[in-house]
Amino acid sequence: MKIIPAIDLMDGQVVRLYKGDPKQKTVYSDDPVSVAKKWQKAGADMLHIVDLDATIGTGSNLDLIEKISKELSIPVEVAGGLRNEEIIDRAISFSNRVVIGTMAFKDKEMLQRIAKKYDFSKIVISVDHIDGFIVTHGWQESTKTPLLDAINEFVSMGFTEFLLTNVSKDGTLEGPDLEYLEKACAVQNANVIASGGISNIDDVSDVQRKNAFAVILGKALYENKISIEEAKQLVN
């Protein structure tokens, strides 16, 4: 299982939000490049960089993300607000993978076109949910689409990479949602990245037991409740 630290950017700063709420943010650093290098040095397999301003429509940190990517030797996955082809083209030009959420549900034709242009392995489908139903637009809009129906549909289209977040767990340190993680990981040909709620090394162990492809470390890492080194030791 891969260990992937998250760097969430807002106004050029490294922040964490509580349950995705921009009003409940904690700033951890004014120097995202040094944070990225720190996680790389600690042994991260990949970095998950989220543009929160783009997600909620208040700006863009894409120039900064490009700068961070160019400073690193490990793979970078870019997420947040990638809702049109032009922005996705740009993000893919300097990263290894892009995470697409809202647009994947709103425009499947464009999604297919982008996947065929770059390769399906470069596209990670973000399946964000509350109680098993998909939410989109930076978690502001709920849908009636069941999580597992969505994953199965994307797998049938040729997609294999998924980022699974239970929004009600994100940034809470309350432990991961193992119930839906287990169901998602049971879908054939789906590589699932578990995100949200990780609070300690035991949570990482629980996620690994559900056969997740990778785990995202966020708040627990920034609050020093877990280290990349101990997580790597566990999964190896």
Swiss-Prot record:
<dbReference type="GO" id="GO:0000105">
    <property type="term" value="P:L-histidine biosynthetic process"/>
</dbReference>
<keyword id="KW-0028">Amino-acid biosynthesis</keyword>
<dbReference type="GO" id="GO:0003949">
    <property type="term" value="F:1-(5-phosphoribosyl)-5-[(5-phosphoribosylamino)methylideneamino]imidazole-4-carboxamide isomerase activity"/>
</dbReference>
<keyword id="KW-0413">Isomerase</keyword>
<dbReference type="GO" id="GO:0005737">
    <property type="term" value="C:cytoplasm"/>
</dbReference>
<comment type="pathway">
    <text>Amino-acid biosynthesis; L-histidine biosynthesis; L-histidine from 5-phospho-alpha-D-ribose 1-diphosphate: step 4/9.</text>
</comment>
<dbReference type="InterPro" id="IPR023016">
    <property type="entry name" value="Isoase_HisA-like_bact"/>
</dbReference>
<dbReference type="InterPro" id="IPR006062">
    <property type="entry name" value="His_biosynth"/>
</dbReference>
<dbReference type="Pfam" id="PF00977">
    <property type="entry name" value="His_biosynth"/>
</dbReference>
<keyword id="KW-0368">Histidine biosynthesis</keyword>
<comment type="similarity">
    <text>Belongs to the HisA/HisF family.</text>
</comment>
<dbReference type="InterPro" id="IPR013785">
    <property type="entry name" value="Aldolase_TIM"/>
</dbReference>
<dbReference type="InterPro" id="IPR011060">
    <property type="entry name" value="RibuloseP-bd_barrel"/>
</dbReference>
<feature type="active site" description="Proton acceptor">
    <location>
        <position position="8"/>
    </location>
</feature>
<protein>
    <recommendedName>
        <fullName>1-(5-phosphoribosyl)-5-[(5-phosphoribosylamino)methylideneamino] imidazole-4-carboxamide isomerase</fullName>
        <ecNumber>5.3.1.16</ecNumber>
    </recommendedName>
</protein>
<dbReference type="InterPro" id="IPR044524">
    <property type="entry name" value="Isoase_HisA-like"/>
</dbReference>
<feature type="active site" description="Proton donor">
    <location>
        <position position="128"/>
    </location>
</feature>
<dbReference type="InterPro" id="IPR006063">
    <property type="entry name" value="HisA_bact_arch"/>
</dbReference>
<keyword id="KW-0963">Cytoplasm</keyword>
